[in-house]
Amino acid sequence: MSVYLTAATSTVAKTLSKQTALMLDQTVELPYFRAFEQPLVSLPELYRLIEAQIEQTSLKAGWSLNELNNVPILLGSTAYVIADCEYRKANGQPLPTQHSLSVIADYLQMRYGTQVFSFATSCTSSAQAVAYAAKMLENGLYNKALVIGFEMFNRLTFEHFHAMNLLSQAESYTPFSAPNGIVLGEGIACLALENQANSDTSCELLGISGLTDKQNLTNNSEDALRELIDRILSHAGLSAKQICAVKVHAVGGNSDEMEIRVLREMLPYSTWILAKPFVGHTLGASGAIETAFLFNAFEQGELPALNWQPHNEALPLAQYNPLTEGYYLNYFLGFGGSSAGWILKPQKIKNG
């Protein structure tokens, strides 16, 4: 049974801003993609944001809100309730007596009367949620599903990345072109999946695959990326020549060089789509947020323009060409060896 992405909405940063790191009581201003006004998002505010995204996406897909009790919700995040704990601490409120990833799922289950599933596989959390939602639809368990990826600023995550010397201090986020570190971001996205296309803007999901990298828990190995791409192409029944563009991982770190090498060798005919220079690395939310980024580009008929010139003009970046109808590879890599990906085939691209 086929699976289609029929609607996507997101709330992400509009511009690159700054966030203060406080490691060892030494303050330093680092670039950060801030999407929300609140320094720390409380749990009630997070519920409000998730509900608003669910409503926007459902209406965009042409669904009635009354049918959501038959639509499973799959959540993907890295932080889950950490921002709320920090909010409570900052405002002199007691911390939760129990710590559980299922707190948000329990609330949404009561709110909508449906099954809710939580995924925590580091940076691929919401990507894995997409993969499992698609499996549910393929196996006829449901006709529709919602996938939500969310990541809110919290100091625990931010300071840990800073302590590992992984964060960029540059004014622009230039992965692949001039990798100088990761720029983190916050945001939320919601994807609507169905077992049939409901409009010209629907995208078919093909070749959905996952892989666990057993070689390296903190970096992405070349062999694992090659195997992931092979699996996706094989499951989709496509050749490398048929892939018109690739939404790359491209975090701006040490793995960029390896990723570029693999793409040049395995997909020499494809252009590359960079998403993180516009939204930052949103960690567990990136699967949903970057898929929404790509889906919205299909609706607009073009990708947003980069605000910097590539240092390497030989990079085949898709940002400088109109989008065309065809097959788009979309993959995600994460700490702990988790990886996932699929191919999107839009039914129609505006002016495409």
Question: Locations of the language-model features?
Answer:
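Conserved "HGTGT" condensation-loop signature of ketosynthase/thiolase-family condensing enzymes
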Residues: 1-116, 135-138, 154, 163-183, ...
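Short, conserved alpha-helix that lines the donor NDP-sugar binding/gating region
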Residues: 130-134
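Short conserved active-site loop signatures built around small residues
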Residues: 126
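Compositionally biased, intrinsically disordered linkers/stalks adjacent to structured regions
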Residues: 120-122
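Glycine-rich anion/phosphate-binding loop at the beta-strand->alpha-helix junction
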Residues: 144, 149-153
